[in-house]
A protein has these predicted regions:
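Conserved beta-strand edge residues that scaffold enzyme active sites
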Residues: 30, 34, 108, 131-132
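Conserved catalytic-core motifs of GNAT/GCN5-like acyltransferases
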Residues: 105, 118, 123-140, 152-153, ...
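Extreme N-terminal starter segment of soluble prokaryotic enzymes
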Residues: 2-4
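Residue-level recognition of the GNAT/N-acetyltransferase active site
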Residues: 74, 78, 105-109, 134
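Acetyl-CoA-dependent GNAT
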Residues: 7-80, 87-97, 145-149, 155-167
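Conserved catalytic core of the tyrosine transesterase superfamily
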Residues: 42, 101, 107, 133, ...
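Conserved GNAT acetyl-CoA-binding A-motif
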Residues: 94-105, 128
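Short glycine/proline-centered loop/turn elements that form peptide/ligand docking sites
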Residues: 87, 110-113, 130-135
Length: 167
């Protein structure tokens, strides 16, 4: 089963929105997705397996920071390397676009996602109280710095090698 990471376009929206609705309590609307895809300084990629969209990642590029805004994987495809492949593609493309740091927020209860992000060198630096709606759960703020350097490049090569072995 091959996994392709491709740029998101409007033909992917129905599948992406279905995934969003399964994994997020307040999924993005079609209008918001369309607006995001049209905005500058955005990087949206989806994972396609056997012709079906199984995940999506979205990044906002601001100055030399890359802010991961969304990572969503179809529940049936979770724990199969999809999120890792999406994060790898996002990190590589953000670096190519000039990013020197990677940041995101993640639910404090989402320990699985936190472990994934730690693999990418993201470390907790703070909390945002009541960040997530509708339940008011706190967000853990995570950052990775110097992602344009040789140590981070080696980290990404290691992750890519693990993905190749798992495929």
């Amino acid at each position: 089963m091959s996994l392709d990471i491709v740029p998101v376009d409007k033909r992917h929206l129905k599948a992406i929105m279905a995934i969003d609705a399964q994994v997020y309590p307040t999924p993005w609307s079609r209008r918001l997705w369309q607006q995001e895809l049209e905005r500058e300084h955005r990087l949206y990629r989806c994972a396609v397996r056997d012709g079906s969209v199984v995940g999506v990642v979205g990044v906002l590029l601001v100055a030399d920071d890359a802010h991961v805004m969304t990572v969503a994987v179809d529940p049936a495809a979770q724990r199969s390397g999809v999120a890792t492949a999406l994060m790898l593609a996002a990190a590589e493309e953000a670096i190519a676009a000039g990013a020197k740091a990677l940041t995101l927020e993640v639910r404090v209860s989402n320990t699985g996602a936190q472990a994934l992000y730690r693999r990418f060198g993201l470390a907790p630096v703070g909390h945002r109280r009541g960040y997530y709606e509708p339940d008011g759960e706190d967000a853990l703020v995570m950052w990775a710095h110097d992602i344009d350097g040789p140590e981070y490049e080696a980290r990404l090569r290691g992750i890519a090698a693990e993905l190749d072995v798992a495929a």
